[in-house]
A protein has these predicted regions:
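Short alpha-helix
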Residues: 156-172
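A short acidic, Gly/Pro-enriched loop at the edge of an enzyme's catalytic core
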Residues: 89-100
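Short, glycine-/aromatic-enriched active-site segment of Class I SAM-dependent methyltransferases
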Residues: 135-155
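Conserved alpha-helix/loop element of class I SAM-dependent methyltransferases that forms part
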Residues: 11-29
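A short SAM/SAH-binding and catalytic strip from SAM-dependent methyltransferases
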Residues: 100-112
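A short glycine-rich, Lys/Arg-flanked "PGG" loop and its adjoining helix->strand segment in the class I
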Residues: 114-129
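Class I SAM-dependent methyltransferase SAM/SAH-binding core
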Residues: 32-36, 40-90
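C-terminal helical/coil "lid" or tail adjacent to the Rossmann-like core of SAM-dependent
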Residues: 178-202
Length: 202
């Protein structure tokens, strides 16, 4: 499944970021996991193949849902991964349905953060875990459009890390780990963008 990573881990940080989140999430084989904004289900296939857990994917785009289902079949993981078309603000799942909710770079597309986190809290079992990776607005930073997730300011719902943490607390979550990796990400991005030294071929 990881051979598809360039195609199906199209969030910030790609497969590397998914692996880092996996290390923190402490997901067990017996857990039922929900991946919100699953896209082509790359992280879901990573989880299912690495851990043997069952994953439900929630995705708004019918095309992504169809692509995810196809890739699940081609990789032999369709028995462990189910794909649902729907909104993160009105999830088609009962209360207390999942041990873990997984989400990568979805919040900046959603204006109503309180509704989003309330829905996540609703579908989590008591004592369940919410593992997520999110872009955050920097202090005093200016956004230049178009962005990867927004063509103009009306589509951009980026908030600060502090606001995210506050709304999570209001929604009933207790933070076991809330880590700002902005500096590390910036360092990696700068290093990746640096030109390689020129060499002479003889």
């Amino acid at each position: 499944a990881e051979a598809l990573a360039a195609l199906d881990h199209f969030h910030t940080g790609g497969l590397r970021a998914s692996r880092e989140l996996l290390e923190l999430a402490q997901i067990r084989a017996e857990d039922r996991v929900l991946d919100i904004g699953a896209g082509l289900a790359g992280p879901a296939r990573m989880l299912a193949s690495a851990l043997g857990c069952r994953v439900a994917c929630l995705e708004m785009s019918p095309d992504y849902c169809a692509g995810a289902a196809l890739l699940n079949r081609l990789t032999g993981l369709e028995e462990r991964i189910e794909v649902h078309e729907g909104s993160a603000l009105d999830m088609p799942f009962p209360d207390d349905a999942f041990d873990v909710v997984w989400m990568q770079n979805v919040g900046m597309n959603i204006a109503d953060k309180r509704k989003l986190y309330a829905e996540i809290h609703r579908v989590l079992k008591p004592g369940g875990r919410f593992a997520f990776q999110e872009m955050a607005a920097g202090k005093g930073a200016t956004s230049y459009f178009p962005l990867p997730w927004a063509t103009d300011p009306a589509e951009n719902f980026l908030v600060s890390a502090e606001e995210t943490r506050s709304v999570l607390g209001e929604s009933g979550f207790i933070a076991e780990l809330f880590e700002d990796t902005s500096d590390a990400h910036l360092s990696r991005t700068t290093a990746d963008a640096a030109p390689s030294p020129l060499t002479l071929g003889v």
